[in-house]
Amino acid sequence: MTSAEMTSPNNNSEHQAIAKMRTMIEGFDDISHGGLPIGRSTLVSGTSGTGKTLFSIQFLYNGIIEFDEPGVFVTFEETPQDIIKNARSFGWDLAKLVDEGKLFILDASPDPEGQEVVGGFDLSALIERINYAIQKYRARRVSIDSVTSVFQQYDASSVVRRELFRLVARLKQIGATTVMTTERIEEYGPIARYGVEEFVSDNVVILRNVLEGERRRRTLEILKLRGTSHMKGEYPFTITDHGINIFPLGAMRLTQRSSNVRVSSGVVRLDEMCGGGFFKDSIILATGATGTGKTLLVSRFVENACANKERAILFAYEESRAQLLRNAYSWGMDFEEMERQNLLKIVCAYPESAGLEDHLQIIKSEINDFKPARIAIDSLSALARGVSNNAFRQFVIGVTGYAKQEEITGLFTNTSDQFMGAHSITDSHISTITDTIILLQYVEIRGEMSRAINVFKMRGSWHDKAIREFMISDKGPDIKDSFRNFERIISGSPTRITVDEKSELSRIVRGVQEKGPES
């Protein structure tokens, strides 16, 4: 099967669509609606270090490995030896492909001893060399890295532009699908440094590496794919050991199946409050101030999975593995034994150790390798530090979307800013994404500090509306009765309600009579 078979136009369609060539770059074919237009040139533009050369090499490598389509790589910057050496870090053996006649690297890099142009500048010789290589190797894919170097080597930009037009026209005449890289000065400035490169190409892809808050965030944007459709806007990506990995969040569809099967939270009373437990493929958010018992709920959640011989992964971003093991053991949970049985995996990392896209990739990789039935993230708020609201929301969408796709039950925690009193759950930008929200908070009752728990929201199920007392003992969580004689608990200012004892006794008797004798 060729790279164009699944994206070729329908012969019966009224309008002839443009066939596309799949790049097999993770996520790119989704946002480009099938890949790059066949027989056309695509300009990949970005500042230094954004991954332009990597994109151009991966485009060729995937074509050779996945579809047995030979390629030609034209380098104006690095030597072929450097390119082959750098590609090895991604597990790509370009030297072997060269020896097998599947890849040809055309060295047009500058002479280290300098060069002097005598007479008029043209690319006729280079064009003929490229043409010869394409014909000899029957190449369908061509990458040129980079156009900027041509401008830097020669001063006459108008002449260089003319020659680039000639080069692109010749490649189009041959029918090669071409990727050309160019450098830009600013992340959100002109598309290319010399302002003419984008007019030479049919398509433009922009790579960015923007500093947001305290972290850098890589994004890819398809600015244009002439004559064909594509998804608009920026999409986050990361560079892994296997190359570029784009997260096409906008391409995600709400097509996952919904299950009526319930799973236990690990706390019997909480299961009762949720109408019998969490739905199997749901995402639960436990939110509250520090110390309200969120990590304890997470621990019970993963312990229950292991007790039922199901696998679980705990992603911890606030506590070390040793601390998690110690705290769990103090509540009667032996996480080490669960790990030995290969039922539990604990992944600990500082949020600042990587960007959100890198953390998302790690989470997806761990899920793919370990195949858990449940995951827990403690906590999302730690990952939100130093990043924009949009980047954080995209991260949460990526995690929840992947968990639902794999039919995994997920319990995430979020630490609220306010120690007591009401706090807006919607400020975290994740309340609408999750299926169930458990609200934990501190309340002051009769001069003493107490904890309260409430099932704030649960999609598709009845749930208890009461605000109940939540106690933590050496045996773990213990949910008591509701604060029946108090109101305004969520606001942080509980007020005692005067209760007429006779009326209250009548209410209790009436409730018992309505319930009737147990069968």
Swiss-Prot record:
Effect of residue 146 to W: Loss of stable oscillation in presence of KaiA and KaiB
Effect of residue 432 to V: Has in vitro phosphorylation, ATPase and KaiABC assembly-disassembly cycle with a period of 51 hours
Residues involved in ATP 2 binding: 290-296, 331, 451, 457-459, 461, 463, 465
Sequence segments annotated as region (A-loop, interacts with KaiA): 488-497
KaiC domain ranges (all copies): 1-247, 261-519
Temperature behavior of the protein's activity: ATPase activity is stable from 25 to 35 degrees Celsius.
Protein name: Circadian clock oscillator protein KaiC
Organism: Synechococcus elongatus (strain ATCC 33912 / PCC 7942 / FACHB-805)
Source species taxonomy: Bacteria, Bacillati, Cyanobacteriota, Cyanophyceae, Synechococcales
